[in-house]
């Protein structure tokens, strides 16, 4: 069992929105690893970061991602920083990984004043976002099997583009 697609990208790139729509279009479930982490620990991501630190959060995240890659056969949406873990990057090998690309300006606009993003909290959000992009974009590109520009594209158009590039059998082919 393996996910149909694994979505990666910076905060605001559309992983949750695109994930929901893509899963619906494919007739499969969506597993968001950030939600799975909160369910598993009974704590918010912001609380884990504040209390235990980023390193402990990344350890928990890697465990959740590895389990999801082994057990989930729908669409998998990873937290924006999951690819910073070498173990996660290695585990993604052989999977269909879709990098939802976004510009820094669009990412800052989309994330707005969202307080549930610990690494973007506080002043100078635009600078923090650009720093995250500089660190993570090369990692997203390294693990991606498909790159999709989400700038100035509505979610429906992004999903249609992904569907056109996925190797998805039609219902009649799947029945044979």
Curated annotation (Swiss-Prot):
Consists of three domains: the CORE domain which forms the binding site for nucleotides, the LID domain which closes over the active site upon ATP or shikimate binding, and the substrate-binding domain which functions to recognize and bind shikimate. It is an enzyme of class 2 (transferase). Monomer. This is Shikimate kinase. Belongs to the shikimate kinase family. One of its GO terms (molecular function) is magnesium ion binding. Its main location: cytoplasm. The lineage of its organism: Bacteria, Bacillati, Actinomycetota, Actinomycetes, Mycobacteriales. Its EC number is 2.7.1.71. Binds 1 Mg(2+) ion per subunit. Pathway: Metabolic intermediate biosynthesis; chorismate biosynthesis; chorismate from D-erythrose 4-phosphate and phosphoenolpyruvate: step 5/7. SUPFAM superfamilies: P-loop containing nucleoside triphosphate hydrolases (SSF52540).
